[in-house]
């Protein structure tokens, strides 16, 4: 698996129930434009605001609808046994990968994190993508990632959502250098080209919900060695990522941008998250007009 993977938003109705027709429409759109992978129950999908039953429902619905891209299911939780249960479910429905962020809320030692992932890997067979997002959960150090990948062949890659070129560099040199089949993805739009240049495999990036054409054009230009064009798209993505600075949360930023671009997904976040108002929406609109 390489390329542009989209961590999709979860569409909600005004009453906060899941908007299934909007989900179907969005998955159809992303596959038609040619993204390489679709990731459901992601951070962008507000998985922490979903019940276990809703997460299972979305995973099953996504598996039914995603037919022309790699299919990834998020199974993270602070409860190791629940992660195993959700990961087994992702495996049983035929997902290509399970994406698992570390436990959050309670700080854990590296040994505790190793045990968490070890238990999951030993109880499941599905390929696992580690997800390092230290702003929201316990951090995965490079030595810990290397130890896990050496011990467990099913740990197939990592998504790194942190503003550090050095971390990506070290994962590629120290981990991918030992296991050539290990996949390395950035979670930040502005680091997409950096990651490819360093030898990574792509990105799992939220702005691809509303502007996948930029990510896809960059990836194509890079692979075809049209580097000036790739640099231009990278500059656009760097500017586009400023959308996160405009809004009060990444969820609000993405759903406002989708509204501005004409998607039918409603600008609704589940509590406790809140949407920004008209003033922020107009700033998002101005940014998108400048970049796109």
UniProtKB/Swiss-Prot annotation:
GO cellular component: cytoplasm
Domain of life the protein comes from: Archaea
GO biological process: small molecule metabolic process
GO MF entries: 2-dehydro-3-deoxy-phosphogluconate aldolase activity; 4-hydroxy-tetrahydrodipicolinate synthase activity
Residues forming the catalytic site: 43 (charge relay system), 105 (charge relay system), 131 (proton donor), 159 (schiff-base intermediate with substrate)
Disulfide bond sites: none
CDD domains reported in the protein's UniProt record: DHDPS-like
Chief location: cytoplasm
Compartment annotation: Cytoplasm
UniProt similarity note: Belongs to the DapA family.
The protein's name: Uncharacterized DapA-like lyase TK1237
Annotated source species: Thermococcus kodakarensis (strain ATCC BAA-918 / JCM 12380 / KOD1)
Lineage summary: Archaea, Methanobacteriati, Methanobacteriota, Thermococci, Thermococcales
Gene designation per UniProt: dapAL
